[in-house]
């Protein structure tokens, strides 16, 4: 689930054991929200594992993003197709662990509010979808980030993440750098003449991260 910082901690600690030395971490979309939540929860311990983190096109306000993708074009196209991949996986999990969640409610779900109420929230111990989104969003915790430098990159025309919900300078701590270009979409950021290329994004993020090695 999108706030599973314990899984991020498990992965990073094992990477650190396998490859001792300075480490940088990048999370994309939901993975970026997870990475930021980990950095927040780990506090000072995070700085002993990574030198810096970056979150790209990450939904740090899960409530606002869920509401955005549950309406209009996003719901008709993206949500419908994404749920078509998620529901079979959830139902397969119920075959392994009967009674874990309500199978019929999962089958009926047509948006993420219904799906997270039926599956994600109950299996991870949340009261409901709104409780899950609120507790797993990185945005409310960004102001407390002081131990690890963090880059939070979001395009203001991301079709899934409304610009109105992006963090402002006053909502983040001194360790957080905000990049919010007007264009870039969701993990797009094309550059150059048509058809363009996407080399600028990893180069820019890499250059920012290298400053902290």
Regions found by a protein language model. Give the residues of each.
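Alpha/beta-hydrolase active-site loop
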Residues: 1-18, 37
């Amino acid at each position: 689930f999108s706030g599973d910082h314990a899984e991020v901690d498990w992965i990073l600690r094992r990477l650190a054991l396998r490859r001792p030395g300075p480490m940088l971490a990048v999370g994309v979309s939901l993975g970026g929200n997870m990475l930021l939540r980990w950095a927040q929860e780990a506090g000072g311990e995070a700085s002993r594992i990574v030198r810096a983190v970056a979150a790209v096109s990450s939904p740090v306000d899960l409530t606002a993003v869920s509401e955005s993708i549950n309406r209009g074009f996003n719901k008709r196209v993206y949500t419908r197709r994404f749920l078509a991949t998620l529901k079979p996986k959830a139902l397969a999990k119920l075959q392994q662990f009967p009674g874990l969640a309500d199978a019929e409610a999962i089958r009926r779900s047509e948006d993420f509010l219904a799906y997270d109420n039926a599956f994600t929230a109950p299996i991870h111990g949340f009261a409901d979808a709104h409780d899950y989104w609120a507790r797993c969003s990185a945005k409310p915790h960004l102001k407390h980030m002081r131990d690890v430098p963090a880059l939070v990159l979001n395009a203001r025309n991301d079709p899934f993440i409304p610009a109105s919900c992006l963090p402002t300078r006053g909502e983040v701590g001194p360790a957080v750098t905000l990049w919010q270009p007007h264009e870039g979409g969701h993990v797009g950021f094309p550059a150059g003449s048509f058809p363009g290329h996407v080399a600028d994004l990893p180069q820019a993020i890499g250059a920012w991260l290298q400053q902290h090695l």
